[in-house]
Amino acid sequence: MKKKIGGIGLCMLAWSILTCAQTITPQAEQRAKDIVSKMTLQEKIEYISGYTSFSLRAIPRLGIPEIKLADGPQGIRNHAPKSTLYPSGILSASTWNRELLYKLGQGLGQDAKARGVNILLGPGVNIYRAPLCGRNFEYFGEDPYLTGETAKQYILGVQSEGVIATIKHFAANNQEWSRHHASSDIDERTLQEIYFPAFRKAVQEANVGAVMNSYNLLNGVHATEHKWLNIDVLRNLWGFKGILMSDWTSVYSAVGAANAGLDLEMPKGRFMNLENLLPAIKAGTVTEETINLKVQHILQTLIAYGMLDKEQKDSNIAEDNPFSRQTALELAREGVVLLKNEGNLLPLKGKTAVMGPNANLIPTGGGSGFVTPFSTVSVAQGLKELKKKNLLLLTDDVIYEDIVHEFYTDANRQMKGFKAEYFKNKTLSGQPEVIRTESSVDYDWGYGAPLDGFPTDGFSVRWTACYMPQTDGQLKLHIGGDDGYRLFVNDKHITGDWGNHSYSSREVELPVEGGKEYRFRIEFFDNISSAIIRFNAYSLNEAKLRQGLAKVDNVVFCTGFNSNTEGEGFDRPFALLRYQELFIKKIASMHPNVVVVLNAGGGVDFTNWYDAAKAILMAWYPGQEGGQAIAEILTGKISPSGKLPISIERKWEDNPVYGSYYENLKAEIKRVDYSEGVFVGYRGYDRSGKEPFYPFGYGLSYTTFAYSNMAAEKTGEH
């Protein structure tokens, strides 16, 4: 890794009354015990769960203020509508730069203080076991040492600002699929060598203030109920004295969690509450001393950070912090990885076309890692600034035309729009309560009802329409919703996400024939909470595309995943969306010099389109300043220097964990056998002899090295 920071010197810069890394002193422990002794049993039980979704309750009579928590690893997403969007964790790890990672922590800490946030819910350090995990983008790769060093500097930076960092998710939360029900079955050697080291380093070398348990089970026991994990290892073996909290709704038993070392249930006391714990204490299945220790752990951590003695909000720090913006830019510059540069196509020369679904936006992963920034610089914007008149925009808004206004309610083509049928049930069953014509399918009903007299939850809607193109062509169809949605064309299921979930979306391309009728059917249901449904249809103007490509010397195609296709709560496919792969090859058939800028939180399947691209830039999720950094790399203003923190397989079947990632799908507790043991990532490829498509640590630059006029001089007998 690059320049190492002198820990002592940096801690001298921190808030003067804090010790380096905010060690919990005997004085802090005693003060916490004194406060606990003054609390009623009811106050103590109420204090070990969230007051709101992202705060702990205040107890004014004891001098305890309200404590604010906030997601997440890539930026502060609570307690203010906008914040700095830093690059994803996997990009940060690709910098291999301790000094810059410390600055990332400082920026996050400053952003937290600007909003009065006490506890940051990051970093995430779960090991990259397979490319399918939806939260890989938040984490730091496949190597325990790199992950541990990255997390250490991140934590030291955050906590130098007087903000508590939270390392998560303890432990072995290496997939999002069935995360509440899947058991990670792992032998102890593998835990100690692969999955524990980053947590251990965070506790013992960075003095992290908080640890978050994971959703999953470990060897058949939920993490929040795992005494060996939380007490024997974390507390007794590693010496952790801080706060052990649950992930949000990852507690499944009051007594089990209370006796297994969990201090804090979030977001609310669904299990560890008065209703459950008072009878348990009376029955002797939980002791009051156990409750006391939980409250003490929370309070002594807050005391160590001065949070009972000072206002956390620092009004001298701007919410849109210049230091944070600059740090986000520096990370993006150093973490983007150049994977391919055939014929030295890069840096770009001559006139460039920029295009693709991600050219006009800065994509990021979804879930608690999603942040709304004050501003962003897209790749198109970044290139426009640097290439000026030598840039042609062929972005989706230029080459695709909205055709929803050409839809008719039926084949008679008398009335434009969609026939909408509304049902007061989730199953589209029976007769619709309301039938009407609507000009589009674009609704965000929030927590309200779709129509007067309808329930706010548990309803469904069907829209039907007909479309007849004038000529052969290609449509791009986008559909998204919260909860279930699905799209049919001529009674064939095209795409969808038919289940209970937060907002997600799907995008497909559909070839069409001129003069042929296409019948569209969109179905939607709302389960509970918010209700959203959106549908858009676009037609590719291929003539405009060909005319544009004929005018340029090279093409930058920005593609990959985004917050709707990669994120918390679901796993993603290894391959890009099929239409994206096909479009890369389509562009390559029209122009010889294609550069692919790829957004993803981990490895992808390159095999279907690798030969179509002369250059490939792994941009990960580069944060709000990512477009500027990518443009600087593409134009040669800076040389790419990122190195992969993962191995990328040729095909999913080559991965060492293939065959043991999804198992026993129908069981209530799904057992995932980590049968590869310690041979995850590059260790597995070393053992199997299979060659990855790109090895761990790979990354090109524009620099060339050469030796000339070499000579050896004999200086002695040997």
Stretches with model-predicted labels:
Residues 20-475, 480-493, 498-718:
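Glycoside hydrolase catalytic-domain context in secreted enzymes
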